[in-house]
Amino acid sequence: MEDFEKKGAEYSASNIQVLEGLEAVRKRPAMYIGDISEKGLHHLVYETVDNSIDEALAGYCKNIEVTICEDNSIVVQDDGRGIPVDMHPKEGRSALEVVMTVLHAGGKFDKGSYKVSGGLHGVGVSCVNALSTRMLSQVFRDGKIYQQEYSKGKPIYPVEVVGVTDLRGTRQQFWPDGEIFSTTVYKYEILANRMRELAYLNAGIRIKLTDLRPDEEGNIRTETFYSELGLREFVRHIDSGRTRLIDDVIYLNTEKNGMPIEVAMMYNTSYSENIHSYVNNINTIEGGTHLAGFRTALTRVLKKYAEETAQKQIEKAKIEISGEDFREGLTAIISVKVAEPQFEGQTKTKLGNSEAAGAVNQAVGEALSNYLEEHPKEAKMIVDKVILAATARVAARKARESVQRKSPLGGGGLPGKLADCSSRKAEQCELFLVEGDSAGGSAKSARSRATQAILPLRGKILNVEKSMWHKAFESDEVNNIITAMGIRFGVDGEDSKEANIEKLRYHKIIIMADADVDGHHIETLVMTLFYRYFPQLIRAGHLYLAMPPLYRCKKGKVDKYCYSDEERDDFIREYGDGNENSITLQRYKGLGEMNPEQLWETTMDPERRMLKQITIENAAEADYIFSMLMGEDVGPRRDFIEANAAYAEIDA
C-alpha cells in the first residue's frame, strides 16, 4: 500500500477517479444500495455521511450535522475541506459535478487522497443523487459558496458561486425518489443508532442528529453523539446491562503491516459471547478473517496462560478447555481499516482479506499477553470463569445428547405437542409458535394442514439471557422448539455452540402471542432465545411475529378487523361520525377469544394476514437492548422502559 503524509496530500480535481455512469443505478438500485425498502432509504444517509467520515479519518473534519427536514429530505453538512470544485483534467467539468454524477468517482478511489474509506459498496454520493428526485450540493471553499442542483442524478445547471462564507466544508441535501423507494419516511431511531455507532467507532468526531418533524406536542428532537474514548466507551455501552467480571477494558490501538487495528474487550458474568466486528466502519455481521484472527489469538494466549497457572484445577475438573470457553461472557469490538476490502458472504458483510487474520492475531496476542502478565488478579478471575464454562459445556453436551434426535426429517422423535404439516418442502412450510394450549388448539383447527405446523408453548419459556448455556437443553419448551425446527448443535465440532440450520424444516417461524403485556413478554423471551442460540435464522429472514387484530369494528353491514388503535379511530371517524358508542366494538385481549375461522382469516391466512419480519439492523444495539431488557440488572431496564414508554404499548 502506498504511504503518504495526510497533511501533505493535496485534495483537488486531479485526485478524483472516474469509473462509470449513473443510468445503471436507477435501473437496478438494489444492486447498489442493498434494497429499495426502509433499509435502502436509510442507506442513502449512510453513504452521504461516509464521505464526511472519510474527511474526518484523513484528519480534516471534526463536526458532522445530519438533519431530517419536515419534508423528509435529508441534510448532511461537515467542516472538512469541501469537495474540490476546480476543473477535472480528463472530464473537462467541475470536479464537484463529476463526484455527484459519475458512479464510483471520488477521492476514495485515488490512493493518495484517502488511505481507507467507508461506504459499504463504495458507490459514493453519486448513487444517492441518482436515487433522489432532487439534490442540492453546496461546497464552502476558499471563502466562496459553490452550488449545483440535480434531478435524478442529472445536473440542472453548471457549478456556480452563489455567495461568500467563512465556513469550510460540504453541505448535501437530497429528496429520495418515491418512484424507487417503497417508503420515503425516515425513522429517527434507525439513524440515531447508526450515528451513535459511528461516533464510537471514530473517537473525537462530533455527530449531531436533528429531526425537524415536530411530534404531537410540537417538539423537535436533537442528539449529539461524541465519544472521546471510542471503542472503550462502546464496549461499556453494550455491556451496561450486564454485571462486569473485571472492571478493566482490555484495549489496543495499533498498526500491523500498514493495517490500523483497534480492539476493546471486557468480561462479564453472563454466558453469551458477543463479538462485534467492523471493517472501515461497516459492521461485518458475518465476521471474516479479522474475527478469525481475533479468536485464534484469544484461544492461543489464554490457553497457554491457563495451562501455566491453573493446570491442577483443570485436571481436577476432568475437562479439556476449548476455544469457545474463552469467549463465554466476553464482549468485544474489533475495528480494522483495510485499503481494499474484499467482502464475501450472502449479505456482502464478511471480510475475505487474508492479511487481516495475521495482523489481528499478532496485535491481539501481544496486547492480551501483556495484560495478563501485568494483572494477575484479573487474569485469575478470567481463568476461573473459563474453567466454569468448560465444565458447563461438558454438562450441556450430556444434556443435549439425551434429547438430540438422530434425523430431523426422519419423522421420529418430533415433540408430541407438535401438529406437523404434510409438506416436506421446507421453503413452503411454516411453524407457528403459539402462546398457550387453548390458542394452540384453535390454531390447529384453523391451519392449512399442508404447509402450517403448530407448536403450542406452555407458559413463559426459559429466559436464556440469565441462564447458563446448558440450561436451555434441560428445558422441555426450548428443546421442543429446537427439535421441531430441525436444528442441531455440536455438528461442526463436538462441542460447538454454533447452531447447524442445514436441515431447517420450516422457512417461516412465526411467533403468535396475545396482544397484551404477557404476550409481548413471551415474544421477547422467544426472540432472546433465537438471538442468542440461532441468530443465523434471524439474519436469513426466517423469524416473524404474527399480528393478530386488536379490535373488531361493526357498523351496519360493515365489519372490519383493526390491527392498531389508529385503524380503529379511522373506522370510528368514517362510520360512526367520531362517536365510539355508535358502533359495535370488540376488543381482543387474547388469541383464545377468536374461533378457529376468525383466527385463520385474521392471523394465519397467507393471503390476508399481516406478519412482521424480525431483522437485526444493528447487531451491537440489539445486543445491548437484549442484555438490558432480559438481564439481571433492574435499573437500566427501568430507565429504558421509561424513556421508551411513548413508543411501547402498555396494557394496563
Identify the function of each model-found stretch.
Residues 89, 344-357, 561-567, 571-572:
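Helical (often loop-to-helix) elements that flank the catalytic cores of nucleotide-handling enzymes
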Residues 1-15, 22, 44-46, 54-56, ...:
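GHKL-family ATPase ATP-binding module
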Residues 391-410, 425-430, 441, 445-447, ...:
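C-terminal interaction appendages of subunits in large macromolecular complexes
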Residues 88-89, 96:
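Short adenine-binding "F-helix/F-box" segment of the Bergerat
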Residues 82-87:
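A short glycine-centered beta->alpha linker in the GHKL/HATPase_c
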Residues 27-46:
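Conserved short strand/loop->alpha-helix "switch" segment adjacent to the catalytic nucleotide/phosphoryl-transfer site
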